[in-house]
């Protein structure tokens, strides 16, 4: 099975080698038929401490690294 890749905004970079990424998605409400935004926060492993709060990061599933971390950030794309 392929690993999921999600994109979100880093909301916290306070932990050592850890960032918290907020991923937003849109759904259609089943009764109201209105588009609603939903978000979820993921703890992700950042080996090089490269990401700072406010930056856009892509995360990919990985084997569990700790109690909360089962995602890791992909390296920044070089421009």
UniProtKB/Swiss-Prot annotation:
<dbReference type="Pfam" id="PF00366">
    <property type="entry name" value="Ribosomal_S17"/>
</dbReference>
<dbReference type="GO" id="GO:0003735">
    <property type="term" value="F:structural constituent of ribosome"/>
</dbReference>
<dbReference type="GO" id="GO:0022627">
    <property type="term" value="C:cytosolic small ribosomal subunit"/>
</dbReference>
<keyword id="KW-0689">Ribosomal protein</keyword>
<dbReference type="InterPro" id="IPR019984">
    <property type="entry name" value="Ribosomal_uS17_bact/chlr"/>
</dbReference>
<comment type="subunit">
    <text>Part of the 30S ribosomal subunit.</text>
</comment>
<keyword id="KW-0699">rRNA-binding</keyword>
<keyword id="KW-0694">RNA-binding</keyword>
<dbReference type="GO" id="GO:0006412">
    <property type="term" value="P:translation"/>
</dbReference>
<dbReference type="GO" id="GO:0019843">
    <property type="term" value="F:rRNA binding"/>
</dbReference>
<dbReference type="InterPro" id="IPR012340">
    <property type="entry name" value="NA-bd_OB-fold"/>
</dbReference>
<dbReference type="InterPro" id="IPR000266">
    <property type="entry name" value="Ribosomal_uS17"/>
</dbReference>
<comment type="similarity">
    <text>Belongs to the universal ribosomal protein uS17 family.</text>
</comment>
<protein>
    <recommendedName>
        <fullName>Small ribosomal subunit protein uS17</fullName>
    </recommendedName>
</protein>
<comment type="function">
    <text>One of the primary rRNA binding proteins, it binds specifically to the 5'-end of 16S ribosomal RNA.</text>
</comment>
<keyword id="KW-0687">Ribonucleoprotein</keyword>
